[in-house]
């Protein structure tokens, strides 16, 4: 037994094994990314910052059906509907989302019959104060205008699975 221990110590078996393992990983490509300069590709189903969409003619998509408000498990959505218009449709006068309460489950997006509320591709919306995470209708519409191209592409890619 002593001879075996002496042979291992003499030939530095553990050191050579560890060094060989290190060299194997040293020459492989790095699995890490240099964030924020490099980013992982996102799934079309990624759930990020909320946005309200418009139709191509500029009209808001939201018809004030309040399904998203009803289905939200965190009760983070508040909607107030305006009076009916001449054509019988309604629009929202207030559409607020408390992003502090939101759990990003995507139920609001699934419940919406006209794809008005969506969770967009933006994951970088860090803020300095809690009040900035209370989104009103104007902020949601701005997000929709900002990310419309990516949102439309993601919805089109996901359409066969809906």
Swiss-Prot record:
Residue ranges of the 4Fe-4S ferredoxin-type domain? Answer: 52-82, 93-122
Q: How does it sit in the membrane?
A: Peripheral membrane protein
Q: What is its main location?
A: membrane
Instruction: Name the protein family.
Output: Belongs to the complex I 23 kDa subunit family.
Quaternary structure per UniProt?
NDH-1 is composed of 14 different subunits. Subunits NuoA, H, J, K, L, M, N constitute the membrane sector of the complex.
Task: Tell me the function of this protein.
Answer: NDH-1 shuttles electrons from NADH, via FMN and iron-sulfur (Fe-S) centers, to quinones in the respiratory chain. The immediate electron acceptor for the enzyme in this species is believed to be ubiquinone. Couples the redox reaction to proton translocation (for every two electrons transferred, four hydrogen ions are translocated across the cytoplasmic membrane), and thus conserves the redox energy in a proton gradient.
Protein's recorded name: NADH-quinone oxidoreductase subunit I
Q: Look up and give the organism this protein is from.
A: Beijerinckia indica subsp. indica (strain ATCC 9039 / DSM 1715 / NCIMB 8712)
